[in-house]
Amino acid sequence: MNFRLHGAFSNPSFVKIFFTKASPERRLTCFHVTKHGYSFQTDLHDYRKIMKFVISRNELGNLIKKVQNVVPQSTPIPVLTHVLIESCNDELVFTATDLTVSTRCVVKAKVYESGSVTIPSRRFFQLIRELTEANIEVAAHSGEMATITSGSSCFRLLSMGKEDFPMLPDMQNALRFTLDSERLKDMFQRTSFAVSREESRYVLTGVLLSIANGTMTVVGTDGKRLAKIDTEISLDPSFSGDYIIPIKAVEEIIRMSSEDVQSTIFLDQTKIAVECGNTLLVTKLLSGEFPDFSPVISTHSSVQLDLHREELISLLKQVALFTNESSHSVKFSFSPGELTLTANCTKVGEGKVSMAVNYTGETLEIAFNPFFFLDILKHSRDELVQLGISDSYNPGIITDSTRSLFVIMPMRLHDD
């Protein structure tokens, strides 16, 4: 092939480009032709195409979205801000990791050249969201550049090779069992809200997954409230183990779980993985011992009340407007046939609401954080929930018919 070149060469000249057939990689070799003969040669191997595929914009956007949240926003390791893309046999594999949580997603696509590349994840996702054409072509070149083509638009993103990207942990030899994805999602949703967001309380920043006697129990707590739910699983009843899953991994499992699909859960001493449909998530476990919560949930409640959930949610939202920002305390006053909620703040005023309840004892007062109580009610599934209390100093126990249990610690009774 002959090309006439300007600019980079001092004088207009011709370049001959040859495919070197002897090379299995079909290297491109460039010879600069002068009047005195071949003055030099350049190996263009670094710019050959190493991957190419075409996929619909919607499917590519959904694919990136599934792995995007795992990518760290800031890290001293540049390749971790990238997503690894591998193409082979009309399949694409997207992988992302922050070295604690890793996720991999597989989809079908039209693959023209098998290969791999890593692309800056957030920039790539932002670009795909702005494109309007139905299909997108992605091609990677060994010169650390990826080309994204959509209709008449063409973009080039700096990329990196696969060799620097961490490998996904191997879970093939891990113990495994299956569980309905919607059930798994529901269990994590109804417990993760209670997890501590304070890094100083390390083990409480994760959700406990405990297995014993053929039952899987999921627990989240921050020390002020606790959420627990369990379900039976198809696993040898003699097996037992406790696994503390980072909240980031739990939130990703909730996102990836879909209806009418079985999830496979893999258990290892230091890792746990969940596979749902075409997505696999692997996470390291938090080290440490989860606090023993059995004394709290086994507390005997001398008073058992039925509460209408929606009505109580509405009343709590109203009276919470009158709480002190430093304490957020609402007084629950139980008298025969009635529950009265009271809050007052010197800078705002006072709120007082009431509802009918099936209480027949003497007047009983206890204070709770209304926002913690609202969280619990929002994660209950029944319209009628049961509240168990004993006095002003012991925790309240809230249950429904779905094998869930919630604990909320009382607050000090006082007037602002």
UniProtKB/Swiss-Prot annotation:
Q: What gene is behind this protein?
A: dnaN
Q: What name is this protein filed under? A: Beta sliding clamp
Cite the entry's keywords alphabetically. Answer: Cytoplasm, DNA replication, DNA-binding, DNA-directed DNA polymerase, Nucleotidyltransferase, Transferase
Q: What do the Gene Ontology cellular component annotations say? A: cytoplasm; DNA polymerase III complex
Question: Mind listing the GO biological process terms from this record?
Answer: DNA strand elongation involved in DNA replication
Taxonomy, superkingdom = Bacteria
Where does this polypeptide localize?
Answer: Cytoplasm
Homology family = Belongs to the beta sliding clamp family.
Its ancestry begins with: Bacteria, Pseudomonadati, Chlamydiota, Chlamydiia, Chlamydiales
GO molecular function (one): DNA binding
Q: Could you tell me what this protein does?
A: Confers DNA tethering and processivity to DNA polymerases and other proteins. Acts as a clamp, forming a ring around DNA (a reaction catalyzed by the clamp-loading complex) which diffuses in an ATP-independent manner freely and bidirectionally along dsDNA. Initially characterized for its ability to contact the catalytic subunit of DNA polymerase III (Pol III), a complex, multichain enzyme responsible for most of the replicative synthesis in bacteria; Pol III exhibits 3'-5' exonuclease proofreading activity.
